[in-house]
Design a protein with these regions (language model features):
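Intrinsically disordered, low-complexity acidic Ser/Thr-rich regulatory segments
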Residues: 1-50, 60, 64-65, 93, ...
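Amphipathic hydrophobic-ligand
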Residues: 52-54
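Forkhead-associated
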Residues: 57, 61-99
């Protein structure tokens, strides 16, 4: 086996590609939910930025079908790489390799 395969998480993962979490890998297993925001009481991944709400969005992993559900709760918006702004409060299913922008283009994550 090559070393790249050995280092990849077994489930899904979220990769920080821009901003304070660039280069970080957050492992996800079936049903895991990650809450991103600026509030230490409302989020478990904290981004201190004027464009990030206290509870900005959640990302939930569905390992059975290999997709993620993203739900926006913010004022500034959660966007996909094609510029689509997610509808606030409505869960959106996104496939792996989707890039998600949190508030603005300065904070971006790729779901894998």
């Amino acid at each position: 086996m090559d070393s790249e395969r050995l280092n990849k998480p077994k489930g899904g993962y979220i990769e920080g590609i821009r901003g304070v979490y660039a280069g970080y890998i957050i492992e996800m297993e079936q049903g895991d939910e990650l809450t991103i925001g600026s509030s230490v009481t409302e989020a478990n991944l904290i981004i201190r930025n004027e464009h990030v709400s206290g509870r900005h969005c959640t990302i939930t992993y569905n390992g059975i079908v290999g997709s993620y559900t993203v739900t926006d709760f913010s004022k500034e918006g959660t966007y996909l790489s094609d510029g689509t702004r997610l509808s606030c409060g409505n869960p959106t299913i996104v496939p792996v390799n989707t890039i998600i922008y949190i508030g603005d283009i300065e904070n971006a994550f790729k779901v894998r």
